[in-house]
């Protein structure tokens, strides 16, 4: 993947974050630090390099969109603060919500979405955040490292950064891909913890 494509993806990421930047303190009142979710540098060539077939990708995209639409219509929940991923109908909810009640709402709306098999969560509350101002730096640093690694580059690995914690989701073909991703994350300044939902695709 060339530098121009990487630059375009970064500009997309910054455009996505613009509302959060302009809302400033108001948004941070609820989230402490807005998680970087929904930013995936592999979207541009996802279909050609994703380990899933086109049919499975399309089905997962529908599930993801349905859940995001429900989040949009639910008071206290925001797609800016919660990332939704779906792989073979297994749904991953990652981000920050105001409290346990809203976490329950989030899980319930995913449960009641057709096409969902299982639900996995990495949900934190504002009080869990502490001092964390490095989400963007962590994300860009990690993405840059993953791009350069021939073992990981071009896979469907997704990265979310929540309160300076790195969360991986996606489908991989080799355990070494997960090991490399985790190693990079653990060696980035400011990362508090690393959690992996990565699953190996079995033949």
PLM features per residue range, with description:
Residues 20-23:
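Bacterial Sec-type N-terminal signal peptides, specifically the leucine/valine-rich hydrophobic h-region
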Residues 2-7, 11-15, 25-203:
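N-terminal targeting leaders
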């Amino acid at each position: 993947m060339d530098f121009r494509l990487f630059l375009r993806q970064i500009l997309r990421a910054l455009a996505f974050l613009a509302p959060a930047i302009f809302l400033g303190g108001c948004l941070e009142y609820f989230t402490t630090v807005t998680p970087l979710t929904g930013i995936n540098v592999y979207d541009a060539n996802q279909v050609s390099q994703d380990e899933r077939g086109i049919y499975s990708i399309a089905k997962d995209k529908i599930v993801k969109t349905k859940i995001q639409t429900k989040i949009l219509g639910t008071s206290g929940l925001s797609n800016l603060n919660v990332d939704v991923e779906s792989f073979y109908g297994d749904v991953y909810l990652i981000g920050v919500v105001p409290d346990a009640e809203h976490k329950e709402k989030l899980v319930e709306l995913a449960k009641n979405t057709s096409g969902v098999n299982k639900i996995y969560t990495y949900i934190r509350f504002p009080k869990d955040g502490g001092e964390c101002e490095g989400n963007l730096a962590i994300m860009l640093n990690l993405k840059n490292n993953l791009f350069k690694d021939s073992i990981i580059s071009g896979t469907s690995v997704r990265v979310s950064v929540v309160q300076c914690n790195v969360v991986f989701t996606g489908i991989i073909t080799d355990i070494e891909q997960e090991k490399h991703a985790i190693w990079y994350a653990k060696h980035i300044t400011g990362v508090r913890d690393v959690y992996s939902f990565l699953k190996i695709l079995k033949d």
